[in-house]
């Protein structure tokens, strides 16, 4: 029990404060940087900050769900999804740096809240936990679609990162459904969307 607590605490510290690492090459790494005006550059950096905070939330959600999951297949899928979300963290962190931006100052708050939510979802049972994962990924996919629409057309580097993230999120949702995810009730899905809007609006600025 103590060993597991140490492992989980270490994971939280690394997610929040250590540079994230990616096994896969960063999407758009070979694409030449395009000159963006100051306003566009700040806007894209803010969008990527929102995406980075979203990945912080995903890490905490999956950590909480994994801690309370009972089925080994569910634990494995959560671990695999978490690994890919770590890559997303690395990609968005790198892009924020390239654009001269910064990460959200509220990331520890997002992490703590998402960890608690993940623990709660896991306590409801594996199929409901998978349903939570699938719905989270669907909403993230829709959110990334919106970001693609708001990117400057010439910013191909950011576009490639977001498109790969979107493909990964869709795959996570498909796997969760294949493992028997329950569809979440509409009020719960609506509450998730409301919470996501609060996070994205705040992380864009802070």
UniProtKB/Swiss-Prot annotation:
Main location: membrane
EC number per UniProt: 1.14.99.60
Membrane topology note: Peripheral membrane protein
Cofactor(s) for this UniProt protein: Fe cation
Reaction(s) catalysed by this chain's protein: a 5-methoxy-2-methyl-3-(all-trans-polyprenyl)benzene-1,4-diol + AH2 + O2 = a 3-demethylubiquinol + A + H2O
Key words of the record: Cell membrane, Iron, Membrane, Metal-binding, Monooxygenase, Oxidoreductase, Ubiquinone biosynthesis
One GO molecular-function entry: 3-demethoxyubiquinol 3-hydroxylase activity
A cellular component term, taken from the record's GO annotations: plasma membrane
Cofactor stoichiometry and binding remark: Binds 2 iron ions per subunit.
InterPro entries membership: COQ7_proteobact, Ferritin-like, Ferritin-like_SF, Ubq_synth_Coq7
GO-annotated biological processes: ubiquinone biosynthetic process
Gene3D superfamilies reported for this sequence: 1.20.1260.10
Residues binding Fe cation 2: 85, 137, 169, 172
Cellular localization per UniProt: Cell membrane
Record-listed Fe cation 1 binding positions: 55, 85, 88, 169
Pfam families: COQ7
Pathway: Cofactor biosynthesis; ubiquinone biosynthesis
The UniProt record lists the keyword Oxidoreductase: yes
PANTHER family reported for this sequence: 5-DEMETHOXYUBIQUINONE HYDROXYLASE, MITOCHONDRIAL, COENZYME Q10 BIOSYNTHESIS PROTEIN 7
Family from the record: Belongs to the COQ7 family.
Function: Catalyzes the hydroxylation of 2-nonaprenyl-3-methyl-6-methoxy-1,4-benzoquinol during ubiquinone biosynthesis.
Protein name in the entry: 3-demethoxyubiquinol 3-hydroxylase
Organism encoding this protein: Aromatoleum aromaticum (strain DSM 19018 / LMG 30748 / EbN1) (Azoarcus sp. (strain EbN1))
């Amino acid at each position: 029990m103590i060993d597991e607590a140490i492992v989980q605490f270490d994971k939280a510290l690394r997610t929040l404060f250590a540079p994230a690492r990616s096994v896969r090459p960063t999407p758009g790494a070979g694409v030449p940087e395009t000159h963006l005006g100051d306003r566009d550059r700040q806007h894209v950096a803010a969008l990527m900050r929102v995406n980075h905070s979203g990945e912080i939330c995903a890490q905490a959600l999956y950590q909480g769900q994994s801690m309370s999951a009972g089925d080994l297949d569910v634990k494995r899928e959560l671990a695999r999804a978490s690994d890919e979300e770590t890559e997303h963290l690395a990609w968005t962190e790198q892009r924020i740096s390239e654009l001269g931006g910064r990460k959200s100052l509220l990331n520890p708050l997002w992490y703590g809240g998402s960890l608690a939510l993940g623990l709660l979802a896991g306590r409801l049972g594996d199929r409901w936990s998978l349903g939570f994962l699938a719905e989270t990924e669907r909403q993230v996919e829709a959110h990334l679609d919106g970001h693609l629409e708001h990117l400057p057309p010439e910013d191909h580097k950011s576009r490639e990162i977001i498109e790969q993230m979107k493909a990964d999120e869709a795959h996570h949702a498909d796997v969760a459904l294949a493992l028997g995810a329950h569809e979440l009730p509409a009020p719960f899905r609506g509450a998730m969307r409301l919470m996501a809007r609060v996070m994205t609006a705040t992380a864009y600025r802070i």
